[in-house]
Amino acid sequence: MTVEDGHASVVDAFDRLAGGAPECIWSSPGRVNLIGEHTDYNDGFALPFAIAARAYAAVRRRDDGMLRMASVQLPDNDVTVALDDIAPGTPTGWAAYVAGVVWAAREAGHEVGGMDVLVDGRVPLGSGLSSSHALECAVAAATVHVHGIEAAHDDLARLSLTAENDFVGAPTGMMDQLASLHCTAGHAIFLDNRTLAVEQVPLDVASAGLALMVLDTRVHHDHAEGGYGERR
């Protein structure tokens, strides 16, 4: 699916959910890491690149102080919560990844009001492709855009990291978010986790007669509840 096809699909789904069009749609890709597993929180180096699968977030403001969240992958499982009631533990489940970003933005001092948010996560879940970070980055970008908040890529990454660490409870580093936000077509990024400096690195393996293969091991993992936190 192209990005354009993904946007069109989300527009249709948002219309069915809330009636009318969203104010904005943002998307963010999953990633594969060539070198540097578990180096982000150890001040090491990493070399990730983005993949074609993306997460989408469609947003429209509302004036009643409520956050309504829906997922294309989980129909009839909408979650609505008052902004003032959002805190770690409320809500839980898939909606925590959306509400956590909104909470992180408000905790950072940004004026974020009520919204309808529809997400479409097309990065395979629990497969090591950073599905949650792609979703959080898309929600962060859409949230700041619709509220007129100026935010650089690294600012969005920090909002996503705060949501992941302090709201969802997954003790990750920031490599995945930075990869999702900084990677460009035909490149990996060289990430120095000591300074968070990012350098674009050409990755044209096809010109050398090679191909990168990403294989599904069918081993599910969960940063919040698996062994990741224990290893860290």
Which residues does each predicted region cover?
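Short amphipathic
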Residues: 24-28, 80, 211-216
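ATP-dependent small-molecule kinase catalytic core of the GHMP/sugar-kinase superfamily
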Residues: 149-232
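Short Pro/Gly-enriched beta-strand edge/turn motifs at strand-loop
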Residues: 37-42, 162
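Short Gly/aromatic-enriched secondary-structure transition segments
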Residues: 43-50, 229-232
